[in-house]
Amino acid sequence: MKRRKVLIFTTMVAVGFIVSSCFKSTRSEFRSTEEKLPYFNKIVISAPVRVHFIQGDKSSIKIVNKNKHQGQIIKECHGGVLEISWNSVIKWNILKKSEKDVEVYVTSPDLIGVTLKGSGEFISSGKVDSDNLEITLAGSGDILFTDIICDKIKTNLRGSGDIKINNLQCLHSETTLMGSGDIKINSESSTTSDILLKGSGDIEINYNNANAINCKLEGSGDIELSGMAKTLNKQKRGSGDIDINKLRLKQ
């Protein structure tokens, strides 16, 4: 019985040492690098990473990832454009495995353009104030804006990805979807809103106070409009549907 107790105790100590070693190893793998950048107002992402954006006083980038992924991210800033990409020699299966291990934090005083190519993510959790803003997604990635104030905005989606804007205040908006993706916008105010859907995707826009809405659908996709607007002009070709049951037009 005494030998059995000693054996159990020894086994527990060994297991505890292994678990402790694994925990320390996992923590030590993570590394953070931060640096200042020249002024930029456009961001182009062609890497399967998650990019967080905050509008602030300085231009900077911070990368949080694992040691084994250091050097895989290529960042270039020139002509007012910040480009974030992967080293082309890295194999795709490694990139897919690394996607959830990499967080990129970007700060800039201005933002007039965001382009996401592929399966990455772009998240803006704060307010973005700009005269003009163009959002482009080509691929299966995700773009999320919490709050946007601008004069003119263009939202373009080509592919199967998702674009979501929780709060939008603008004078003129252009929303274009070509593919099977989804666009969802909550528009607090807009003077004119132009919508074009070609494909099997879905566009959902809620208007708090819109003046004129021009809507065109070609394909099997669906457009759902809700809220309040003054005028609505709609055209449809294909098996898709333009749902205006929740849209109230001012008299």
Label each PLM-derived region with a short phrase.
Residues 2-12, 22-117, 121-136, 147-156, ...:
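Acidic (Asp/Glu) and glycine-rich low-complexity loops/linkers
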Residues 47, 139, 219:
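Conserved acidic catalytic centers in enzymes
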Residues 163-251:
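Short, surface-exposed interaction patches in beta-rich subdomains
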